[in-house]
Regions:
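N-terminal beta1-alpha1 cap of cysteine-dependent amidohydrolase-like domains
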Residues: 1-68, 73-84, 198-244
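Hydrophobic/aromatic beta-strand patches that form the interior of the parallel beta-sheet core
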Residues: 10, 35-37, 56, 89, ...
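Short amphipathic alpha-helical segments
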Residues: 23-25, 68-70, 102-103, 150-151, ...
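Cysteine-nucleophile active-site neighborhood
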Residues: 52-53, 57-126
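Tryptophan-centric aromatic hotspots in well-structured domains and transmembrane helices
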Residues: 85, 118-119, 140, 190, ...
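Pocket-forming structural segment of enzyme catalytic cores
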Residues: 102-185
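C-terminal helical/coil "lid" or tail adjacent to the Rossmann-like core of SAM-dependent
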Residues: 171-210
């Protein structure tokens, strides 16, 4: 008898032509179809995740502090996976949405610092207990988040700029500020749009993005495989296996 088809993963994207990158490729390799939705362009998010293995909310150039209605709707919608204890992952903007939903502040650095390029990362003891984390990661953000009450900090950046880099909340929700989804093609597109931001505090020129990728991206790739298995394995709804 053929194995039961695996449940799809809900993928929330914020630009018309954006993709889930290698996160999507790794999920597809595990047999999970991708249910891609773009609420910014009118797609409706589901009222339940009962038919999904989990949900991933990706990043985008907008700010959670922008007045657009779709940002508030998405942030409010996070109550659905949180209530159901469905696996939930927020990446970059998605991480900031989760932090905001849980009551934490999200905003720019007081001295105008940004993180665009490769920066150091240190796992906390809780993070080390979860898996092995990369020690340098690819960042592309101008805002950071506070640690929500009841959340567990998993990874830290610089104490002077953006110290909170990853956290977990409850049994199955995770937020990661840095980018684990980037393919080389995505880096090429993104670095073409850096412009004057490379001259801001914490901005790096395009060639440094590729140098960092050549030196350090293998660690993020290894982390991604391990983390996805852990994340999918957190699905305890009705005792079912997350991989179904």
């Amino acid at each position: 008898m053929a194995a039961e088809a695996r449940r799809p993963v809900l993928v929330v994207l914020h630009q018309e032509h954006s993709t889930p990158g290698r996160v999507g490729l790794r999920l597809a390799a595990r047999g999970h179809p991708l249910d891609v939705r773009r609420p910014r362009f009118g797609d409706v998010l589901p009222e339940t995740l009962d038919g999904h293995a989990g949900a991933i909310v990706f990043g985008g150039p907008m700010s959670i502090n922008d007045p657009d209605d779709f940002l508030k709707r998405e942030t409010d919608w996070l109550a659905v996976p949180l209530k159901e204890n469905a696996p939930l992952l927020g990446l970059c903007l998605g991480a900031q949405m989760l932090a905001r939903h849980l009551g934490a502040a999200v905003g720019t650095h007081a001295d105008g610092h940004i993180e665009i390029g490769w920066f150091g990362l240190t796992a906390t003891s809780a993070g080390e207990a979860l898996t092995r984390w990369p020690d340098r990661v690819h960042q592309f953000h101008r805002e950071g988040f506070g640690l929500p009450a009841g959340a567990t900090l998993l990874a830290e950046g610089s104490a002077e700029t953006f110290p909170n880099q990853a956290f977990s909340y409850g049994p199955a929700a995770f937020a990661i500020q840095f980018h684990i989804e980037l393919t080389t093609a995505m880096v090429n597109r993104w670095t073409q749009r850096i412009g004057d931001r490379a001259r801001l505090p914490g901005g790096q020129a395009a060639h440094l993005h590729f140098e960092g990728r050549a030196l350090h991206d293998w660690k993020t790739s290894t982390f991604l495989d391990a983390f996805l298995d852990i994340w999918l394995g957190r699905d305890s709804r009705q005792g079912r296996a997350a991989a179904e």
